């Protein structure tokens, strides 16, 4: 068994299974033996079986037949010989190795029945021969003869490739096709020969038209030329311009390289407008200014954007002193009235004897001829015929009104300005209009006061009434303090605006008479502790206020910054503090402390803010 396993492994290792196919054929031409295997009275039936194996140094008749096996049909034979038989075919599906071992056996069939295994009885074996041969693939038959001890066998064999297989080992597969997988035929050696219009290893690549660009074109069938994205033209050699490009070229897709004389993103701006359009008429000179613009320099006598208009030189009234103008080609002439001459009738032919100066002007003769008028201060002109307007140059600033007085000009200033030309803004804060330490900001004929805390009005002369908005809730009484409103709450309420009820909360917390439940006892204990805590807090607050009052009294007994001011105020200045008789302001660290002697009515007390100040 071990020998058989090793034999099988060796057989498999020698066989190179590939996609190949072929046929081994063997023909028995004659067989004779000295042994008698037939009865004398009749002919016998025999058949031949072959076993094709890989090449072995010592040929074993034992299976397996690694390359394949085959046998003839049952043949009729005479007493000791047999004539030729049909070929035995052994197909194989591997790469033909070129060497092989061959075992040929002759068997007695006992009867002419075909489908019966006569090899189970070794007594039916007539002869067996084994040989090792080298055989190349081809259609030619190899003749061979084998001489045994008592037999002679003549036979021939060959190996040829199956259809669609080629090569020395029948390992080259080539099947002609004309579909999506290829378009080719096969030559005698199994090489693919592409059909017309196809190329490539599998003849699956169509051959495009001869002028089709290899880089920018492609085809799906022979003779076509389809362009890739960004290219166009019959041969796909023209790049596609940027969309909207008018006068540009490209070397790569989506470019817009402007041609000479054109510019802009889309090459739609004519940079050489003069050459391309010649817009200037009448011999004018055209100059490109870029971005499709130009200017025309006109010849004398012409005007307009394109010099298309002929200018009448008389339109500008060049003739002076009442002369009449005559238009000429690119020129003019003046017909001067009596007493004037020159190109524009600008030269006066009159003399001082003609009394040419008006409005009191003085005439003086000139050595070169003619005269000159010396005008009085309020007139001007060659003959002092024009009245001089001294307000024409607008001498008054800041909206001042100019009044021409003849020899001079007068400026009437707007309210808030002064000066000969109204150039000075009057300082409206110079007279200190802001009261009660307010800060003044000058404006134009106006001022603005920034009032200190507790005062209001245009000049900060009015006390601010912080109680106008009625901030105190639940019947609280409002008092005006310089720091804002102060609320005196009625019993049962507390807070800066008397917004928190006090008695209602305590009534809800107090237990009803006659209830002795454990929860009531617990609430009573809590209320007792809370009452003790509140009493301690109230005592501390009262003690702190007394100390603060004493400290303020000590501070107000002194005069800070070496300044003491005593103000005796009447009732109308302090309507809210009627009985003040003396106020001492003391300045310390930017704060104001007030000490006052005051007689309070019965049942009334001072109110103090959280900072300790009088409210």
From Swiss-Prot:
Disulfide feature: 161-170, 174-186, 194-203, 208-219, 212-225, 227-236, 245-250, 258-267, 274-286, 280-296, 298-307, 314-325, 319-334, 336-345, 352-363, 357-373, 375-384, 391-402, 396-411, 413-422, 429-440, 434-449, 451-460, 467-478, 472-487, 489-498
Cited PROSITE patterns: ASX_HYDROXYL, DSL, EGF_1, EGF_2, EGF_3, EGF_CA
Record membrane topology: Single-pass type I membrane protein
Main location: membrane
Gene Ontology MF terms: calcium ion binding; Notch binding
Compartment list: Membrane
Keyword Signal on entry: yes
SUPFAM superfamilies: EGF/Laminin (SSF57196), Growth factor receptor domain (SSF57184)
Post-translational modification: Ubiquitinated by mib, leading to its endocytosis and subsequent degradation.
Signal peptide: 1-20
Residue positions the entry lists as glycosylated: 459
Chain segments annotated as transmembrane: 523-543
Keywords: Calcium, Developmental protein, Differentiation, Disulfide bond, EGF-like domain, Glycoprotein, Membrane, Neurogenesis, Notch signaling pathway, Repeat, Signal, Transmembrane, Transmembrane helix, Ubl conjugation
Record topological domains on the Cytoplasmic side: 544-615
Boundaries of every DSL domain copy: 159-203
PANTHER family, sorted: CYTOCHROME C OXIDASE POLYPEPTIDE VIC-2, NEUROGENIC LOCUS NOTCH HOMOLOG PROTEIN 1-RELATED
Protein name: Delta-like protein B
Originating organism: Danio rerio (Zebrafish)
Gene from which this protein is expressed: dlb
């Amino acid at each position: 068994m071990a020998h058989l396993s090793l034999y099988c492994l060796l057989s498999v290792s020698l066989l190179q299974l590939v996609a190949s196919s072929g046929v081994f054929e063997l023909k028995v031409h004659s067989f004779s033996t000295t042994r008698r295997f037939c009865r004398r009275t009749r002919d016998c039936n025999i058949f031949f079986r072959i076993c094709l194996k890989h090449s072995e140094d010592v040929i074993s008749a034992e299976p397996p037949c690694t390359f394949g096996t085959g046998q003839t049909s049952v043949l009729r034979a005479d007493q000791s010989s047999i004539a030729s038989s049909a070929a035995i075919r052994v197909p194989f599906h591997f790469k033909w190795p070129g060497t092989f071992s061959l075992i040929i056996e002759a068997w007695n069939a006992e009867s002419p029945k075909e489908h019966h295994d006569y090899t189970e009885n070794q007594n039916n074996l007539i002869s067996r021969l084994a040989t090792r041969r080298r055989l190349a693939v081809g259609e030619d038959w190899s003749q061979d003869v084998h001489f045994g001890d008592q037999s002679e066998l003549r036979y021939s064999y060959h190996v040829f490739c199956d259809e669609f297989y080629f090569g020395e080992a029948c390992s080259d597969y080539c099947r002609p096709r004309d579909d999506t997988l290829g378009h080719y035929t096969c030559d005698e050696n199994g090489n693919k020969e592409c059909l017309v219009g196809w190329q490539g290893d599998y003849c699956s690549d169509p051959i495009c038209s001869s002028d089709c660009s290899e880089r920018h074109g492609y085809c799906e069938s022979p003779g076509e030329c389809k362009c890739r994205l960004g290219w166009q033209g019959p041969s796909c050699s023209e790049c596609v311009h940027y969309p909207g490009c008018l006068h540009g070229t490209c070397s790569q897709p989506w470019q817009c390289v402007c041609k000479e004389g054109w510019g802009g993103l889309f090459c739609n701006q004519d940079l050489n407008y003069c050459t391309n359009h010649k817009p200037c008429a009448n011999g004018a000179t055209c100059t490109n200014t870029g971005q499709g613009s130009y200017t025309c320099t006109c010849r004398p006598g012409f005007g307009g954007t394109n010099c298309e208009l002929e200018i009448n030189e008389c339109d500008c009234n060049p003739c002076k002193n009442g002369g009449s103008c005559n238009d000429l080609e690119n020129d003019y002439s003046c017909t001067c009235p009596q007493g004037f001459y020159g190109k524009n009738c600008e030269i006066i032919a009159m003399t001082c004897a003609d009394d040419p100066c008006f409005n009191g002007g003085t005439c003086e003769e000139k050595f070169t001829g003619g005269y000159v008028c010396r005008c009085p201060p309020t007139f001007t002109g060659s003959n002092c015929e024009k009245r001089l307007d001294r307000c024409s140059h607008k001498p008054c600033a800041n909206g001042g009104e100019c009044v021409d007085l003849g020899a001079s000009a007068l400026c009437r200033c707007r309210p808030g300005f002064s000066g000969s030309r109204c150039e000075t803004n009057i300082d409206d804060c110079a007279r200190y209009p802001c009261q009660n330490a307010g800060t003044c900001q000058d404006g134009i004929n106006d001022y603005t006061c920034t009032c200190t805390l507790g005062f209001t009005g245009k000049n900060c002369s009015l006390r601010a009434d912080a109680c106008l908005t009625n901030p105190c809730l639940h019947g609280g009484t409002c008092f005006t303090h310089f720091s804002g409103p102060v609320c005196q709450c009625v019993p049962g309420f507390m807070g800066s605006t008397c917004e928190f009820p006090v008695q209602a909360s305590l009534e809800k917390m107090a237990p009803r008479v006659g209830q002795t439940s454990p929860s009531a006892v617990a609430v009573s204990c809590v209320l007792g502790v809370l009452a003790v805590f509140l009493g301690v807090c109230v005592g501390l607050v009262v003690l702190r206020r007394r100390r603060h009052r004493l400290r303020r009294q000590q501070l107000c007994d002194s005069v800070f910054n070496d300044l003491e001011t005593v103000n005796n105020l009447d009732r109308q200045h302090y309507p809210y503090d009627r009985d003040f008789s003396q106020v001492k302001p003391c300045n310390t660290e930017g704060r104001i402390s007030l000490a006052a002697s005051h007689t309070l009515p019965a049942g009334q007390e001072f109110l103090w803010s959280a900072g300790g100040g009088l409210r």
